[in-house]
Amino acid sequence: MLIHPRAEPEIAFLLAKDLAGPTSVTGVLAATEAVFGAVDILDSRYQDFRFRLPDVVADNASAGRFFLGPRTCRPGELEDLRLTGCVLRCDGDVIHTAAGAAVMGHPAALVAWLANRLAERGEHLPAGSLVFSGGLTAAVAIRPGHAVTAEFDGLGTVEVFA
């Protein structure tokens, strides 16, 4: 059961091989087997998502659920992930529009950032990891009965019913 869910569109990366830092967007793309359009459902037991770092860790980083789009492609099949457009709709109404560049300039930049932080601890992202880019738009509050749709250029549509 979700408490007060929010939805945000993201781009997900499925790693074909281990990814260790130091790395960059280029390294992430070379290690990626497939990319997906995705919708991340955030939820938190903390009222209005107000919490401190220890709280968010205890709350599993507000992770609720995630949904992957039906179409996958290799990174090179899309001209430039920075230009991958996204339209987020709720019950058919356009709520937000964005492009992949909304996340740190490139959606793979967050994956590189994560691999580099893990490398500082002597760790890495193993092959088979599914890593989300972070929200392309602000998260949108959803209620039971809402239909949330994220349409991605080249990656298809993800539809979620709350």
What are these regions (language model features)?
Residues 136-140, 154-157:
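Short, charged beta-turn/beta-strand-edge "cap" motif at the junction between a beta-strand
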Residues 1-106, 147, 157-162:
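Catalytic-core "active-site belt" of small-molecule-metabolizing enzymes
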Residues 139-149:
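Short glycine/threonine-rich loop-to-helix capping motif typified by GTGT followed
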Residues 107-139:
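A conserved acidic, glycine/proline-rich C-terminal tail/linker
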